[in-house]
């Protein structure tokens, strides 16, 4: 049941409030991988953590407080905009009452901006170039990966479909289209609607299509009569929907409460879409971008001031099976119904187009810019729960709310503006980090040129700083060498345990041991002495060494490939000296990589002192990573790192990768089957669903069920956690620290105990360890914690433990072990005091200190008064003596 507080389809009762009164919405989610929720509050604007929005993003174990001052009375919809959730009833109604309040007069002193928009049916080609713009391969080439979507046959439509698109016209006659050359990249998107605070937007909409359609905006204010969503509750209006060949007029306004907040950028990215049937309408193509800016932020032509280039990109899996034109497309393609019935799943998969603005496999018109330009990327998300997109900008970094990133996260009905100042010339990809999405064509090309007369206002001075010697070597890796935690925690036998499918090597399964390739650090270029992994580095597990650098550094990586196939080292966030993709080292070969660290690789103005990145082998980024070749990289502001490499502002650093290692996509699958599979040849079915699932290891640094060691710290220590995520769309991880909280940055600093991670996101959270004991850290997604994505961290209460407890070993691998050693207690003056009594003790000590201070001040005052009186007496005697002497002289 897709429920809000246990109710579906608008049955949640008693959500009523008065207009002009402040309302707090406390939102939280629980559940599984499908519990990606975007709560859309129709008709009103929210403020969340200082930022304006009308949607809230909710995941398992995430908590959001949204503030609202409702303006327009009426009955309004709250809905999850994830398509399947909306369809299945995750909707509620809230009522805004006037409560005898006089509505405030909106001071709309800006322009009236008119747009003439038509819904027109078109024949759309997802791959107009006929080849992959990145690789040059023909889209229909067998085995290319793109042939699944573009090869036309008696059971496949190919890459051309009937769709409907919003198009802009010059006036109400709808005769002459608006032609803007730099908007060719919009593709299937409608025209950009722009406005400033104080403006009124008037949209004359002409539906020239064969279905009823509407326009429903995000991010602006509108009255009930102009809402484009259909309500079926019997009391609200039916929505302002245009029937075929009908014209309707929408009126939206941008009062101050709808514009960017103080912490927001000058412009906010939004979206408009048809909501007559939101799922089928948007899959048919009806969606467009909307830009709302602060007053004075737009030029006369509507472009943003201070921005040289702007691009609007929609990342979504357009499901042609759910388009209004599905039957028409099958009829046009003259498909054989008999063949379709034999392969329904394959046919439906071929119609799910992993598109950027309606283009696949880098067929989006190339996005050109100059080195040093200020580029605004307006990113939009749409779709269902699999539409979790980590948008990666290869070759350059971006800023999101003043924080440095290489990827921006998108979910259905989310909107992000990323600012880039490219300084790395070349041709690069924009792609979705989720491996299956990228393989299915969700990628595009952007080109950074060194333009004549275009001189960037920055100059970099680099200095050689750090050299790392890293070798790729093949090892046998055990994801779960000790099952005692798993069996005790879940209180089940091995066969009945959740982990049985992943850890058993019976019935054709492989168990927990696999051949893998890993990055390991050596002391010098001879690659004879490995750098030992003890103490601070023990927790890294399968990861390569933690590489560190500062802004202005040159990092040199001397890489030896001691594995049996070609591998490389490629890093996010740095400027690689080689042009294009990094060179691969053949088996036995040694290569040297040079990484420059410019300002744009380091922390942004709203970041912590250091930001986290990642490095991995990129010969085949997906198979190489699942084979094990991945490691952490952190870049700090100048002066943060000590000579030995650690941070001067932190006592400890931990890097954790949360990744479902899919051994089915490892280079070593066949070897692992031969080594660990059934002895009888042909016993293992590589395509069996149980076998496929058994090879998906829900790991933290390559370990399951609390087998990761080394997460140990002392009470009062400052700890930096570098939280990393890669993988597929199922790699949604909400990481919960038990008994501790941390600070994280999102424009400002916020306290939490859960951090959200998605493929391609790297977060830094900072903690002061305060609660002694051994505590659980785990992913809160239900399937993931059951599958072993959990571990322990220990906070030691005093330094003498260092002689007996230096790490979490097998003997203390259970949460119960240290719970009798000072857990929940603090040692004060040789006595163990319960943490819960510390506040009382502290209050008493403060009160006693104040009393003692007052007594000391009083005693000091008395002593000072006595001293002053003695001094006055001496002065009087001296004056009298002098007087007697004078009298004697006169006589």
Regions found by a protein language model. Give the residues of each.
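Copper-binding active sites and cupredoxin-like electron-transfer domains
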Residues: 1-891
């Amino acid at each position: 049941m897709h429920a809000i507080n246990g109710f579906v389809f608008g049955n949640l009762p008693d959500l009523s409030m008065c207009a002009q009164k402040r309302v707090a919405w406390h939102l939280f989610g629980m559940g599984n991988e499908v519990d990606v929720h975007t709560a859309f509050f129709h008709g009103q604007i929210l403020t969340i953590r200082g930022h304006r929005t009308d949607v809230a993003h909710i995941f398992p174990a995430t908590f959001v407080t949204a503030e609202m001052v409702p303006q327009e009375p009426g009955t309004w919809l709250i809905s999850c905009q994830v398509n399947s959730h909306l369809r299945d009833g995750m909707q509620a109604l809230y009522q805004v009452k006037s409560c005898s309040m006089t509505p405030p007069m909106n001071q709309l002193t800006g322009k009236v901006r008119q747009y003439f928009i038509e819904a027109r049916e078109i024949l759309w080609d997802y791959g107009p170039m006929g080849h992959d713009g990145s690789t040059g391969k023909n889209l229909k080439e067998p085995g290319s990966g793109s042939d699944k979507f573009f090869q036309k046959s008696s059971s496949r439509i190919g890459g051309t479909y009937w769709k409907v698109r919003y198009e802009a016209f010059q006036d109400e006659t709808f005769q002459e289209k608006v032609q803007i050359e730099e908007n060719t990249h919009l593709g299937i998107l409608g025209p950009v609607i722009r406005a400033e605070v104080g403006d009124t937007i008037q949209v004359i909409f002409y539906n020239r299509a064969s279905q009823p359609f509407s326009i429903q905006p995000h991010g602006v204010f509108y009255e009930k009569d102009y809402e484009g969503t259909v309500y079926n509750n019997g009391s609200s209006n039916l929505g302002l929907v245009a029937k075929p060949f009908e014209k309707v007029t929408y009126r939206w306004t941008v009062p101050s409460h709808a514009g960017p907040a103080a912490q927001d950028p000058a412009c906010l990215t939004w979206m408009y879409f048809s909501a007559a049937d939101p799922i089928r309408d948007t899959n048919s193509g009806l969606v467009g971008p909307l830009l709302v800016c602060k007053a004075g932020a737009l030029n006369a032509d509507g472009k943003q001031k201070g921005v040289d280039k702007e691009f609007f990109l929609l990342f979504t899996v357009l499901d042609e099976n759910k388009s209004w034109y599905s039957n028409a497309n099958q009829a046009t393609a003259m498909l054989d119904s008999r063949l379709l019935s034999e392969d329904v799943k394959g046919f439906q998969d071929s119609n799910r187009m992993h598109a950027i603005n309606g283009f696949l496999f880098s067929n989006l018109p190339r996005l050109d810019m100059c080195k040093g330009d200020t580029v605004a990327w307006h990113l939009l998300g749409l779709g269902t729960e699999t539409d979790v997109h980590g948008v990666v900008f290869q070759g350059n970094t971006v800023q999101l709310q003043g924080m440095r990133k290489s990827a921006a996260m998108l979910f259905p009905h989310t909107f992000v503006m990323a600012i880039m100042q490219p300084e790395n010339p070349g041709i690069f990809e924009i792609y979705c980090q989720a491996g299956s999405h990228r393989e299915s064509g969700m990628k595009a090309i952007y080109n950074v040129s060194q333009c004549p007369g275009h001189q960037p206002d920055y100059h970099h001075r680099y200095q050689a700083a750090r050299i790392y010697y890293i070798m790729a070597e093949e090892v046998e890796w055990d994801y779960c060498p000790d099952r005692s935690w798993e069996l005790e925690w879940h209180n089940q036998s091995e066969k009945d345990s959740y982990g049985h499918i992943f850890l058993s090597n019976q019935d054709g399964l492989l168990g927990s041991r696999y051949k893998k390739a890993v990055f390991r650090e050596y002391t010098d270029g001879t690659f004879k002495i490995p750098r030992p992994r003890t103490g601070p580095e023990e927790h890294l597990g399968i990861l390569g060494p933690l590489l560190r650098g500062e802004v202005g550094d040159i990092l040199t990586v001397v890489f030896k490939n001691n594995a049996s196939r070609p591998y490389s080292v490629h890093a996010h966030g740095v400027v690689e000296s080689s042009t294009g993709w990094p060179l691969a080292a053949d088996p036995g070969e040694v290569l040297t990589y040079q990484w420059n660290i410019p300002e744009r690789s380091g922390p942004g103005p709203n970041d912590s002192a250091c930001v986290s990145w990642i490095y991995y082998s990129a010969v085949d980024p997906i198979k190489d990573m699942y084979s094990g070749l991945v490691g952490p990289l952190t870049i700090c502001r100048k002066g943060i790192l000590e000579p030995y490499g650690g941070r001067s502002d932190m006592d400890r650093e931990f890097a954790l990768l949360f990744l479902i290692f899919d051994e089915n996509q490892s280079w070593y699958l066949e070897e692992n089957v031969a080594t660990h599979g059934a002895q009888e040849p042909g016993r293992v079915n590589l395509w069996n669903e149980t076998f496929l699932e058994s090879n998906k290891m829900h790991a933290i640094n390559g370990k399951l069920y609390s087998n990761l060691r080394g997460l140990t710290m002392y009470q009062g220590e400052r700890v930096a956690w570098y939280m990393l995520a890669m993988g597929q769309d199922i790699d949604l991880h909400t990481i919960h620290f038990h008994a501790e909280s941390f600070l994280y940055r999102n424009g400002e600093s916020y306290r939490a105990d859960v951090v959200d991670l998605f493929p391609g996101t790297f977060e830094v959270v900072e903690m002061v360890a305060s609660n002694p004991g051994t505590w659980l850290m785990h992913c809160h997604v239900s399937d993931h914690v059951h599958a072993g994505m959990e571990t322990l961290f220990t906070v030691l209460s005093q330094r003498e433990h260092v002689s007996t407890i230096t790490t979490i070993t097998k003997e203390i691998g259970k949460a119960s072990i240290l719970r009798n050693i000072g857990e929940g207690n603090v040692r004060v003056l040789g006595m163990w005091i319960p943490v819960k009594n510390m506040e009382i003790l502290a209050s008493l000590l403060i009160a006693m200190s104040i009393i003692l201070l007052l007594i000391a001040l009083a005693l000091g005052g008395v002593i000072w008064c006595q001293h002053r009186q003695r001094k006055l007496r001496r002065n009087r005697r001296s004056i009298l003596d002098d007087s007697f002497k004078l009298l004697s002289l006169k006589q």
